[in-house]
Structures are given as C-alpha cells and as structure tokens.
C-alpha cells in the first residue's frame, strides 16, 4: 500500500501540462491510489488518499515557497492576497477533500461482476469526484479570474469573447471553473480509465476478495 502511494507521488512529479493557476496533467498518477482502494477496500483507500493529499500539499507548498511553482492565492489585477479563511478553505477543498476522493476507487468492486468494469468505473468515479471538487473550489474562490481568463489571447480567444458577451457573474465563474479545471482533469480522467483496463487484468488485483493489510 505504501509503495502505491509513493508511485502516485512520483508520477505526479512528472506533469505533462502545468497550468498557471494550479493543476497539472500527468500520466495516470492517481491510479495507484485508486488501486489501493480496489484491492484493500474503500476504508484503506480513503486513508491512503488522505495521506497522499497531505504529502501533496506539503510538496506543492515547498515548491511554491521556493518559486518553482505559482501559489494562486492572490487576486486578479492586484498584488493583494486572499484572506486567511479563503486560503485555508482552498487548501481543504483542493487538497484534503479533492485528493481524498481518490479513495472511492474501490466502491464498485463488490457491486459490478466484471473486475475490469469495476476498476475502470471506480477510477472514473474517484477522479470524476475530484474534478467536481476542484470545480466547486474554483467557482467559489477563483470566479474573479473568469473575465481575465477568457479575455486573454490564445486558441480559445473566440470562444472566450463569445462567452463574455453572454455570461457574467456566477454563471461565468461556473463555466470558467468547469473549463479551466477540465483542461487538465478531463484528459486525466480519460488516461486513468484507459490505463486501468490492463491494470485490472493483473492476477493479484483481480482476486475475488479484497486483500487484507499485510497480504
């Protein structure tokens, strides 16, 4: 179980896309935690996922303080930082809650006959819930960035102008959060599900009964 958590952390250190306001796309870095939940049960999965979230936040904070990555805790067009409550709430939602959701990966093991479908479906649920938590956090705390984001030049400039002409306020903030977080989470969901297919065929993972700690 510890090895799977380490594998997840190592995979997360090699992002293929790192967005400026947080979030990155990796090659199925969350799958080892999902597999823990599938093999040992949701209880141990949630424990491993929470441990993963704690280590992840420490690593990101260290990189942020060293200047390696941007800590997106400031307000648009301003040098002012968010208040302490907002900053702590972001850490709780985007790390503790979002990453802990990966522990739901084993929720379908005893409900779906096909082992492959159970693992793939569990991965989709776990990573999908993480995506929705990030969307909620983005909507609440980063909605102020929506207008700035969609007004930037780039490949989606036309789409951004179209949105800005039709939406504002909370609706624009919600679309922004779905869009921004979807840039890295949707590919992550797809890749995780695809990699889960061959992983589900490994004999030790396909065991009829969940493994007990120490097996």
Model-identified regions with their sequence ranges:
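Loop-helix junctions at membrane interfaces
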Residues: 1-215
């Amino acid at each position: 179980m510890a090895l799977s958590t380490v594998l997840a952390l190592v995979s997360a250190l090699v992002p293929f896309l790192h967005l400026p306001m947080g979030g990155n796309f990796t090659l199925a870095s969350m799958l080892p935690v999902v597999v823990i939940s599938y093999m040992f049960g949701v209880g141990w999965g949630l424990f491993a996922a929470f441990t993963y979230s704690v280590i992840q936040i420490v690593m990101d904070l260290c990189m942020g303080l060293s200047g390696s990555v941007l800590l997106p805790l400031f307000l648009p067009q301003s040098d002012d930082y968010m208040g302490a409550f907002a900053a702590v709430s972001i850490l709780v939602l985007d790390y503790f809650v979002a990453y802990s959701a990966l522990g739901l990966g084993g929720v379908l093991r005893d409900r779906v006959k096909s082992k492959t479908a159970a693992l793939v479906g569990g991965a989709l649920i776990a990573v999908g819930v993480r995506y929705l938590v990030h969307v909620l956090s983005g909507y609440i705390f980063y909605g102020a960035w929506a207008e700035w984001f969609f007004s930037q030049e780039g490949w989606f400039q036309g789409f951004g102008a179209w949105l800005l002409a039709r939406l504002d306020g909370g609706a624009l903030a919600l679309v922004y959060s779905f869009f921004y977080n979807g840039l890295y989470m949707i590919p992550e969901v797809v890749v995780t599900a695809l990699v889960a297919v061959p992983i589900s065929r490994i004999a030790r993972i396909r065991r009829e009964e969940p493994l007990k700690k120490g097996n």
